[in-house]
A protein has these predicted regions:
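Terminal, regulation- and interaction-focused segments at domain boundaries
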Residues: 1-44
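Intrinsically disordered, low-complexity regulatory regions enriched in serine/threonine/proline
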Residues: 1-3, 7, 89-188
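Short, flexible coil/linker segments at or flanking structured domains
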Residues: 21, 42-44, 63, 105, ...
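Compact, well-ordered interaction domains used in eukaryotic information-processing assemblies
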Residues: 34-88
Length: 188
């Protein structure tokens, strides 16, 4: 499976696995959870968000010439009126420095590949947990919507990132402020 972004310039700087630091926001560097354990925890989080994981497939992405271990997570959600929707979370682990020339380099590279995917899945699970809390605290937020699939096979998030869903900024009010939403304050 090869993934090639439409606009490689949109890719942010991605650190190598060995350079990912906790103080830069990366988590899961020292997780001892297996890929299967993390898959099960992600499935449970998707369930708590109202979806059902239907597929987990390991593979490899190629992004800007770098091979990155990854996975595709597919799920279904059903709306209140009973209509079903499919979603997909594409997970690309961090690239890693490949060991060459050593007798155990194949095993070392396999371990690094697994570690990269474990760390990526750990962060996806953390993100889904955070989304669940946000869904509880923010009325109208639907955590699984960005990964719903369109008729073209792209997710809503991919379309948005490509600029197809970006709306123009609203016009400023008379005092120069941009109002995107309004709410009513209720006195206790």
């Amino acid at each position: 499976m090869k993934f090639v972004p439409d606009d490689p310039d949109q890719q942010s700087d991605v650190p190598f696995l060995e350079d990912a630091r906790a103080d830069d926001g990366w988590k899961g560097q020292s997780t001892s959870k297996s890929i299967e354990q993390l898959r099960a925890e992600i499935s449970a989080e998707i369930g708590r968000l109202g979806g059902t994981m239907t597929r987990f497939m390991r593979g490899e992405y190629e992004i800007q010439g770098q091979k990155r271990p990854g996975a595709i997570i597919e799920y279904n959600i059903v709306s209140l009126d009973g209509q079903g929707f499919r979603g997909r979370i594409d997970v690309a682990g961090l690239p890693f420095e490949k060991s060459k020339g050593r007798q155990d380099s194949e095993r070392t590279n396999r371990n690094r590949r697994d570690k990269s995917l474990q760390m990526a899945l750990f962060n996806i699970r953390e993100g889904l947990q955070g989304s669940r809390i946000l869904q509880t605290l923010s009325p109208g937020y639907a955590a699984l919507v960005p990964w719903l699939l369109t008729d073209s096979g792209q997710t809503f998030g991919q379309l948005w990132r490509e600029g197809l869903g970006t709306a123009a900024l609203p016009a400023p009010t008379k005092d120069g402020e941009v109002v995107e939403a309004e709410f009513t304050e209720i006195d206790d």
